Swiss-Prot record:
Organism: African swine fever virus (isolate Warthog/Namibia/Wart80/1980)
The keyword Isomerase appears for this protein: no
Coiled coil: none
Induction summary: Expressed in the late phase of the viral replicative cycle.
Membrane topology according to the record: Single-pass membrane protein
Keyword Ion transport among record annotations: no
Family the UniProt entry places it in: Belongs to the asfivirus E146L family.
Assigned keywords, A-Z: Host membrane, Late protein, Membrane, Transmembrane, Transmembrane helix, Virion
CC terms in the record's Gene Ontology section: host cell membrane; membrane; virion component
Localization: Host membrane; Virion
Superkingdom assignment: Viruses
Spans traversing the lipid bilayer: 7-27
Chief localisation class: host cell
Name this polypeptide is given: Uncharacterized protein E146L
Length: 146
């Protein structure tokens, strides 16, 4: 009976160590920073032509100014991760995706929506939209392939 308990204990210790190593590997290695500014086409591409469905994002912040000069920030990590995961069931998943899809719109203050600030209810007319033309926008974060 003592031999079985020792075996179970040693297997448990090995599994805990492997889980700790996997946690450290995922959270502290392989993340590369990215930054896009207003006017850039935002494209995420895998380095080895693997499926974009395996790309993950962390600490992704979309920052923009409004026409009054106020600074706004949104955490868009979940949005980008869900965009990448959306390719998981594709028949021939691509190795890249562009924000805005086939339109390939450059990064601007409307790339992501903050309700009550840059949504359709707030920016109603063409004149309202024209005021946003010179507003700055940036997208920063970390990306990696899992």
């Amino acid at each position: 009976m003592g031999g079985t308990a020792d075996f179970v204990l040693s297997i448990t210790i090995v599994l805990v160590i492997l889980i700790i190593i996997a946690f450290i590997w995922y959270n502290f290695t392989g993340w590369s920073p990215f930054k896009y500014s207003k006017g850039n086409i935002v494209t995420f591409k895998t380095p080895d032509e693997s499926s974009i469905a395996y790309m993950r994002f962390r600490n992704c912040i979309f920052t923009f100014t409004d026409p009054k000069g106020s600074l706004h920030s949104i955490d868009v990590t979940e949005v980008l991760n869900n965009m990448a995961k959306g390719f998981r069931d594709a028949q021939n998943p691509p190795s890249s995706f562009t924000l805005g899809g086939h339109c390939q719109a450059p990064l601007n203050a409307f790339s992501f929506v903050l309700p009550g600030v840059n949504d359709r209810a707030t920016v109603v007319t063409a004149d309202d939209a024209k005021k946003w033309e010179n507003c700055d926008a940036t997208l920063t974060g970390l990306q990696r392939i899992i």
